[in-house]
Amino acid sequence: MASFRRRTCTTGTRFAEVGRRLAIAADHAGAALKAAIVARVAEVAPDWSVADLGGDGSDPTDDYPDSARAVAERMIAGQADRGLVICGSGIGVTIAANKFHGIRASIAHDPASARQGVVHDDMNVLAFGANLITLETALETLAAFLQSEPSSEERYLRRTAKVADIEEEQS
């Protein structure tokens, strides 16, 4: 946890002033995939700037709750429009990210699921399992996630409002 906290508690990572902002972090198991995505994200999402919030794989105590927290806190602070969290399975980071008010995280390992997660469910954080997805599929899925927008259809708005009501009731 020490190396992750050092990286995420500093103010050194800055977003570009143009376009939309993606915050990305990984635990030790997701670090290699995260680094590969960061290196190529401009290919699939040129209008998005990226803040790499840590998890470089050098410290086995870079745990999934820390990476989920880093992304969620950036989003809650209004410093990111969407988030990407990565661990070995994608499950741990999803559970941890969803503990934060206003975060709607889900695993998606294919473009159709990522697109539907945003359009139907207003998903704002995408999770990958590094042990379960290839880099090329991850990039295609990330592109679908970032290119999609929540639907303004009444049925989807009604459903996401119900989810928000549950979140408020449980706060």
Task: Locate the predicted segments by residue.
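Short, structured active-site "lid" loops
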Residues: Y64-V85
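Mid-chain, well-packed structural core segment of small domains
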Residues: V85-N131
